[in-house]
Amino acid sequence: MIIKENFEIKNLTTYKIGGIVKKVFFPETQSEFSELLREQPDAIVLGSCSNILFSSNGFDGEVILTTELKQFEIRGTHVFASAGVKGPLLSQKTAEAGLSGFEFMIGFPGSIGGDVCMNAGAHGQSISDYLTQCCLFDKESKEIVYKKKDELDFSYRHSLLKSGRYILLHAEFDLKKGTPEEIKSLIDRNMEFRKNIQPSLAHPNAGSVFKNPEHDSAGRLLDKAGVKSFDLPRAKVWENHANFIVNKGDATSEDILTLMVMMYNAVKKQYTIELKPEIIFLGDKTEKEEELWNILSH
């Protein structure tokens, strides 16, 4: 296990934002991970840090990073993946094995733990479509438990894991056989779509800022509300897609929250729709940050 103290978390977040964390643990096996969860019940558990905004004020506590939990296995159409396995890697490896289903994950910045927790998806598919069961750590009983797909309360960008009681250790999936040509074609199309619409990680971002409301698109509403012109000194709304915020270089968490509230208010004023954040805000929030986040998450 790797342990780092007084670690600057912005070095790991895709937003390149975040202050000093008191102690960060990098477990390398499932047993190390589950033992840490028993010993550090108040620790924040993170994967690829790709859909989070971490406070520039840091965190006077412990963080567990799953990035070293990279074990995965493919047996026939069955796929086993530890919490830290990256979605694009799994997409590539299953494609090489002639399996179809994970093509939609090719451009995902996240890892399996976070993807299952938020039921990540794209192109009309979600990770829950192929999941069969999860191995979880139950923070209440401090035991390892297994839950089938129908026990995990999956819906749009939601699962039972978002309650915080359960932490994913590994997930199991069942894919379908496909032809290499069809799989590669779909992967290429998905990559091209993401490249044209979404900012690359060369422009630090955390993916979609707001969830889609029922029967509509957050990006469409934000675009119609004129938020693409929103540009602060250190952060701005992405010009090619209104549901993305990029860090222009040295943005703080307060900068991002300020933009989010501006975007939220613009849609609320024009459509009386209150968008819900897709990004998760973590760390020791300042008083101003609490005020801004409360507007977004009330």
Model-derived features: positions:
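Generic structural motif
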Residues: I3, Q71-I74, L131-C134, A235-V237
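Phosphate/pyrophosphate- and phosphate-bearing ligand-binding catalytic cores of soluble enzymes
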Residues: K4, N11, I17, I52, ...
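Hydrophobic, well-ordered secondary-structure segments
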Residues: G87, S91, M105, P109, ...
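A generic local secondary-structure boundary/capping motif
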Residues: I52, T94, E103-I106, N119-S126, ...
